Amino acid sequence: MTVLTIEEMAETLAPRQAIAGLDLGTKTIGLSMSDLGRRFATPRPVIRRVKFTIDAQALMDFATAEKVAGFVIGLPMNMDGSAGPRVQATRAFVRNMEQKTALPFVYWDERLSTVAAERTLLEMDVSRAKRAERIDSAAASFILQGALDRLSLLARSDGDEFS
């Protein structure tokens, strides 16, 4: 497993390979998945956290089932750009995943992703109880969509197409 920049990931991905988005929380791991054209992020059910070995196995099972080519994981930065309190835990999680997978990870600034996800769920008139269930995967979708948009810009500037 390697930590890459989004530009490095763009160079390593083959056409029609999907990537997953992760929003790492203390109780859940929010999941999202790209389409094969890497244009759209779609929320997936969360992984309820138990302990690392169980969480990692659930994530790897998801990656295998969905044929994931790499992960984009939200990095919880403070609004001023400094490392937030959960940055260290996120980096430790990725380091520990090195023992479990050769798939690459990209860190993606997740500032305001949960706020945007909550606002979207409110606009969709999702009840408070359902919002609580869906917020982490919705945030993972915002994280992944940001990375997908960047990949799209990189492809256009290189004259490449994903599909």
UniProtKB/Swiss-Prot annotation:
Keyword check for Lipid metabolism: no
Cellular localization per UniProt: Cytoplasm
One Gene Ontology term, aspect cellular component: cytosol
Protein keywords: Cytoplasm, Hydrolase, Nuclease, Ribosome biogenesis
GO molecular function, one term: nuclease activity
Gene3D superfamilies (alphabetical): YqgF/RNase H-like domain
Principal localisation: cytoplasm
Domain of life: Bacteria
Family membership noted in the UniProt record: Belongs to the YqgF nuclease family.
PANTHER family with a match to the protein in the record: POLYNUCLEOTIDYL TRANSFERASE, RIBONUCLEASE H-LIKE SUPERFAMILY PROTEIN
HAMAP family in UniProt: Nuclease_YqgF (MF_00651)
Protein name per Swiss-Prot or TrEMBL: Putative pre-16S rRNA nuclease
Annotated organism of origin: Rhizobium leguminosarum bv. trifolii (strain WSM2304)
